[in-house]
Amino acid sequence: MGPTSGPSLLLLLLTHLPLALGSPMYSIITPNILRLESEETMVLEAHDAQGDVPVTVTVHDFPGKKLVLSSEKTVLTPATNHMGNVTFTIPANREFKSEKGRNKFVTVQATFGTQVVEKVVLVSLQSGYLFIQTDKTIYTPGSTVLYRIFTVNHKLLPVGRTVMVNIENPEGIPVKQDSLSSQNQLGVLPLSWDIPELVNMGQWKIRAYYENSPQQVFSTEFEVKEYVLPSFEVIVEPTEKFYYIYNEKGLEVTITARFLYGKKVEGTAFVIFGIQDGEQRISLPESLKRIPIEDGSGEVVLSRKVLLDGVQNPRAEDLVGKSLYVSATVILHSGSDMVQAERSGIPIVTSPYQIHFTKTPKYFKPGMPFDLMVFVTNPDGSPAYRVPVAVQGEDTVQSLTQGDGVAKLSINTHPSQKPLSITVRTKKQELSEAEQATRTMQALPYSTVGNSNNYLHLSVLRTELRPGETLNVNFLLRMDRAHEAKIRYYTYLIMNKGRLLKAGRQVREPGQDLVVLPLSITTDFIPSFRLVAYYTLIGASGQREVVADSVWVDVKDSCVGSLVVKSGQSEDRQPVPGQQMTLKIEGDHGARVVLVAVDKGVFVLNKKNKLTQSKIWDVVEKADIGCTPGSGKDYAGVFSDAGLTFTSSSGQQTAQRAELQCPQPAARRRRSVQLTEKRMDKVGKYPKELRKCCEDGMRENPMRFSCQRRTRFISLGEACKKVFLDCCNYITELRRQHARASHLGLARSNLDEDIIAEENIVSRSEFPESWLWNVEDLKEPPKNGISTKLMNIFLKDSITTWEILAVSMSDKKGICVADPFEVTVMQDFFIDLRLPYSVVRNEQVEIRAVLYNYRQNQELKVRVELLHNPAFCSLATTKRRHQQTVTIPPKSSLSVPYVIVPLKTGLQEVEVKAAVYHHFISDGVRKSLKVVPEGIRMNKTVAVRTLDPERLGREGVQKEDIPPADLSDQVPDTESETRILLQGTPVAQMTEDAVDAERLKHLIVTPSGCGEQNMIGMTPTVIAVHYLDETEQWEKFGLEKRQGALELIKKGYTQQLAFRQPSSAFAAFVKRAPSTWLTAYVVKVFSLAVNLIAIDSQVLCGAVKWLILEKQKPDGVFQEDAPVIHQEMIGGLRNNNEKDMALTAFVLISLQEAKDICEEQVNSLPGSITKAGDFLEANYMNLQRSYTVAIAGYALAQMGRLKGPLLNKFLTTAKDKNRWEDPGKQLYNVEATSYALLALLQLKDFDFVPPVVRWLNEQRYYGGGYGSTQATFMVFQALAQYQKDAPDHQELNLDVSLQLPSRSSKITHRIHWESASLLRSEETKENEGFTVTAEGKGQGTLSVVTMYHAKAKDQLTCNKFDLKVTIKPAPETEKRPQDAKNTMILEICTRYRGDQDATMSILDISMMTGFAPDTDDLKQLANGVDRYISKYELDKAFSDRNTLIIYLDKVSHSEDDCLAFKVHQYFNVELIQPGAVKVYAYYNLEESCTRFYHPEKEDGKLNKLCRDELCRCAEENCFIQKSDDKVTLEERLDKACEPGVDYVYKTRLVKVQLSNDFDEYIMAIEQTIKSGSDEVQVGQQRTFISPIKCREALKLEEKKHYLMWGLSSDFWGEKPNLSYIIGKDTWVEHWPEEDECQDEENQKQCQDLGAFTESMVVFGCPN
């Protein structure tokens, strides 16, 4: 420093004399954001102090300081080097509820002996974190979402608090709201939500917040869609994470496909590339390729030419900055499954790296080392590892990046104060100069106090720290040698997760420029911390100086505690489905561990929103209150940027923090970072209190009542009924299957001897997508604090990889998410039954069972069977099994297609079993298939009504009658569901903005002068402080300025006391007569100031007493005997008209404002107020001036007397309904309108208020100026009151009740403002009219929507494609293979129904049973010059070619594309199952069309019997008419008396109606031999139905008689319209006519028929 001139040096010395003599400096340090209900630390220091220093720390509310939120005491002693700390907690008081969303502050005060140090600190209302875990990431309609909420504080330890939870639909509307407490739950709240069947598809949200901090919302998402889990996953991986634009080779990409159980996929991939520019996507059609996936992978390249040709301006430079995406669709050779995957965000770059300085401080200390933390990323943002970087111009300064992409470069800086420009570049050898990345930054010098050039530099080694290691922190000092001996220690502070973790001192000996602090890293330091250090001294200038630095240090992310899930098995065997397995959980003793196992297929569909430990740390890091990677522009900047406040007794302090968020983007990016068992299973799924309901539901019922009927006898509430019904239905279905399994003993062939019988194969049937939603407490004796728990679990039936996810919560170590533990479950022979999400009733579909043989060298001969289920029409019947024998080569698969027609809606079971010949190997799979009704699902809006009972009701009650929906086009035998939706309509009340704090600066003035002038001076400051307090605007005005303003008010108060007379009244001068108005005004101002400064109540109440006793007349009027000199200060009272009314109103207002303070001291006060009020009320109607109407109106409103005619006068006086104005004086009008606004607020007339406030705001009157005292005071008092009282919404409190005829009681809902947006929903299956009644305030909306299935006009099962398939016998001339029994030609024609040709498309052809395609024909189609197809694929097993896949390069949109090839029949089967052809686009399975084919059946359709839209299967053996005489009487009697036979009739055929598919025979019932369920009378007619294929077998003739009997299961339809089906079990026998009985050949039959009839009628059946 240069020499200082004499006088100014002297001045400096004088100014800082006490400091120069070494007076102590007291300092307080706290985080610059304090959090509610969290333990916070304050560091206290007394530098250069002697002896003990007692310290009291108090925390007050701001600005009022009315409450002590916390108070702590401590003593700083020489033994602790006068350093200490206190911890305090700020309770979540009402004070901190911020309705207007404004920031909240507290005043933190430390009193060191007599010296007070205080600081206003920002408060965060966030009281911890909430983490949400769902059991899956994606769900189907009708399934259940299981979720957990983890409640933790800022230290991530469990807390018990009330949590509000909302579930929102994709439109953002909440459909469920809950309030729950995590008290005694160890921070884990388990919840669930049942997704309705009718639900909006898309991304749903779970949002949660702590009740006391609603503004801090934590959320997670889950997807709802109709899907089927895939069997494999596809990964698209470019060889480089970027595309270098000048790379001639192009972009190389590997497509990997693996089954979920780990085996490699064989198939075909369709790959297309595209360019992404922001939201816009341009696909590159020329890049579309089909590649084989062999042994699980395939390669594809996007050439540079295809890329450049695909864009309009093929300049390479124009593509830089954009990115590439690649989409791959992989289809299995069997065609049974298809999975899509995409990789996007592959940047197009000129350099493969990017350099960032986000981890480098922005400030350097001149002449000291500067640590550059260079963060190098790959273009996708992931950290780049082992990349050399150097500083340009200083080639010696080089470093390699570490695993997190960061390299440390230290450079020496020049001692000058100039900004420093630094350029860093990569030095990767393989890259040319042009390809290296380069970046420049500018660092600014740290500024010292008075240019002292005293510095401190903190430096740490660049390593990835882990808990348990030691970090050496270097403290480097640079300062004036003359003063260095003064630095005996450094104070250091460690900030972590927004709190002061540790504070300490590091001793320094004289002469030490470098001091090292060894810092032990513990788990408390995760995920990162800031170390701040400082020293203080009195410098050469005699001025106290603080010098500081800080450094940000990253710590390896891991759990604070420990949690590992692994296998507890000793031997490493491959787990198989249903097997028991042991899990080993190792974690912190006493922790609660929650588990879930998820099928990996779920993550193939959606891998977002999984809860991981790194996500937890990301949330914590986002909440970091520090804002930079270290250092700062000066000492105060260092503290502020690290998230600390520093305040000292010598005037040093950090700037006021007024925002919770950091000013710029975060300074850091984290690293890329058999029945009984089933019964017990079922019961275990329910909570304890509902288990009894479930157990009872599964008990046998002696009366054989249905489950539904049994629930009517339950009185334990709806939840119990629901569980009972679920468990009852479950066990009924199980019993049914069990019974079926034990009765199906059908004939077997000799072949079956060396093979497991079908009934001995237990099918796999439990395929949950997630399970193991368990809670385990680790109470086992610990070893080194770790408890080990062994858990036995039974694996589910899926063949997949399960991801077992575990989260632990410990009250000592907090939350920990373990790495997922994978369990792969498989067997070497199994069936994968691929079912669609849903199928339509009565629509023929093809499903596929894929058989896998993973045996190394063994070909397997397998018998596979589709089991009969009466809910489907298929080749499997009660009488005949649908079995096939197939051969599967080793390590391959085979697809077996089945054609079925579903006949019943709901969940129906499909079961396939397979057994291997000569091996004891089998598998079975039973899955549920969702069958939906025919027709189109329609949502019909029945009614939308606005509920507003005040406006639309009668005497406050609104009734709405809602009609039933018109369902005339509904599909028969389907249900409808009506949803009644209710929602409140929250109407926001626009509140006018507060006057900006900036505009009030001129009001803070110093009062002076006589008793009147002093009040003129004091008024603006009092009202300004009051206004800023009420509107919470100090942070705008300057938080530190409030104290100064209070000092001015104190000064004004003290000065005013000089003008108080012995009578307690006030005058301009002590000797002057006291003034009524002035005394009342002093009372008014002081009453307001009581909340700001200490005011003696005797001063205030003495003046009140004087006004009542000396100046109030018996009629209540107040009189003025000594008017004020400064008439300009009395505002609108200056006008002499209506003086008595105006003055009385003015004094009365003052008395009422002092009432709370003086009521006890002045006994006459209530009486005085009443008298004055009586006077005003009596004379109010005669008032002429708007001013008097306003001021007297406010005085009366305060008393609750402004009503009726008075109120009417008050309101009608307002001009344009927005101001109370007398011509002439603008200031009087502002004052009068302000009184009127206060009156309106008192009346809570919020409809009238807004225009008045708007008018006042439009006057742009901000106080001040001559004659403005009253206008200033009143306008800000009124506007402050408005900001405080004005509601931000209209009142909403609606009671809505629904009376549904089908329900015995009313359904009621109460809608409040808080829950207005919640969508309340009621469902009913009845389509009925009902009544809605609404009462209360506010508005709501009622919507009624009925969902039903409507008959389709022309049902199109095809989307975007037309398809025609024909099969005909081949001409005799065609040559056929030797072993072929028959040859036919299959012709397929297709066309795309789009605007242009379809690109690559696929024909998926399943062959008819026993048929295979001619491979020579296929080769010719693929390899001929006229290539019709691009490629074909057949199942590898030669003799059982079940599926053929043909790839087409394109499908024309303008004409039919046709191809034909021969198919040969190699073996005969009794019944040929139809084949299917499906055409679809490679990128979208929805764009498809399916057709069936069969040699004998039109369209390849299975026969089914439909009548009045009811269908059943008829693909069974036709009945054969009993016509020969071999049938004996006994046989007839035995057969007619078999169980199940319902009726026996003698009938006469009246009429035959033939049709295309089914024939109807109208029979007259001549005699009822055995009556059945149909109460038919003799002579009545009944319809018997038979499929046309049985016409020949039946040969029925009109007018002939027949003996008929049949089963009840052959009835069709409902009474009284019952029809009878002639099925395989129906007996039809010609009954000869009387004349025919004379013939000898018929005599025996006629006698037997007579005897049969007599026996049946007289004796009936023996059983």
Swiss-Prot record:
GO CC aspect terms: azurophil granule lumen; blood microparticle; cell surface; endoplasmic reticulum lumen; extracellular exosome; extracellular region; extracellular space; plasma membrane
Variant or mutagenesis effect after changing residue 1110 to A: No effect on binding of C3d to CR2
Residues with the Phosphoserine modification: 38, 70, 297, 303, 672, 968, 1321, 1573
A Pfam family it matches: NTR
Disulfide pattern: 559-816, 627-662, 693-720, 694-727, 707-728, 873-1513, 1101-1158, 1358-1489, 1389-1458, 1506-1511, 1518-1590, 1537-1661, 1637-1646
Region of interest called Disordered, as start-end residue ranges on this chain: 954-973
Coarse class of the protein's main subcellular location: secreted
Highest taxon in the source lineage: Eukaryota
CDD domains: ANATO (cd00017), complement_C3_C4_C5 (cd02896), NTR_complement_C3 (cd03583)
Modification after translation: C3 precursor is first processed by the removal of 4 Arg residues, forming two chains, beta and alpha, linked by a disulfide bond. During activation of the complement systems, the alpha chain is cleaved into C3a and C3b by the C3 convertase: C3b stays linked to the beta chain, while C3a is released in the plasma. The alpha chain is cleaved by the serine protease complement C2b component of the C3 convertase to generate C3a and C3b following activation by the classical, lectin and GZMK complement systems.
PROSITE patterns: ALPHA_2_MACROGLOBULIN (PS00477), ANAPHYLATOXIN_1 (PS01177), ANAPHYLATOXIN_2 (PS01178), NTR (PS50189)
Swiss-Prot/TrEMBL site ((Microbial infection) Cleavage) positions: 541-542, 744-745
Record-annotated NTR domain positions: 1518-1661
Crosslinked residue numbers (Isoglutamyl cysteine thioester (Cys-Gln)): 1010-1013
Keyword Lipid metabolism attributed: yes
Localization per Swiss-Prot or TrEMBL: Secreted
Site (Cleavage): 747-749, 954-955, 1303-1304, 1320-1321
Outcome of substituting residue 1153 to A: Impaired binding of C3d to CR2
Official protein name in the record: Complement C3
Protein's gene: C3
